[in-house]
């Protein structure tokens, strides 16, 4: 009797979309766009992950308005032209058997900053000399992210309403060019998460103060997007389950928020953490170890009854499989591991005994690799060493 197929390589159907396995390529900003437009770098970058066997390939956060970009190199989806530039890339991802997905976002008080490798802080004269432009970041309040960062302008109520529409329209554009999953970015200190966190939100109107008020704008965005996209299109939301800072957002808040998301029709909670940098130390309880955020996914899944996605230092197929088997999550996201090895999903399948004949690899690769493996076996070499 053959061994049961690893859960990591079982399909998952959500609404009208079936993912071929439970591996998700997490959205990671590349800071390589020009005026918000996707270019050849992005097309090749995302093609690797689809060929590498991931169930879902997320395109990095795309800003819903021009001034919502984190950096001058960030992707945008604030116009039809920006969305249309992604169409052929989306089609290729799908042609390789992966589900194309996109994260839509607004950088909030982290906007108008340097690219990560330039320092990840406020723009300098060197940036301006290189052609970068600056704009005023916005947030729930005028509280800057940290000492030395630009002071954001507090959004007016009318602007909050306009941004809700911008998220809605961005989601509609994404679906029109073929994206099959939409994720709203509500984590890592960006605009929507800064409304949730008491560390950033100091408003005294209907969008600040109580938990109910702080959730109002993010929930309005989720509702607008859910109403705008087809019923068969899954909607994910990425959250920071905790701030990791005393007096900040806690897991109990995330559980309550997720209950509201479930009522709206959100399908998956993508459980990350942190990002609201403030002057002072991060909570000493933060220990970055393999799977350190998976407990947040487990708790939200158990207490809310909603699907979750675990992310964060999930480096081995064995850990990914164990998290699924323990019912800690429904999907497993990898990021830097996929950058280091885009073929991690295919190799994980072989390692867990789910892809012995390379049947899930791109056909040309499968043919060559099968011959290679056969040759090694003929020489009497150990199967334990064939990948070396």
Predicted regions, residues:
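Flavin-dependent oxidoreductase catalytic cores
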Residues: 1-388
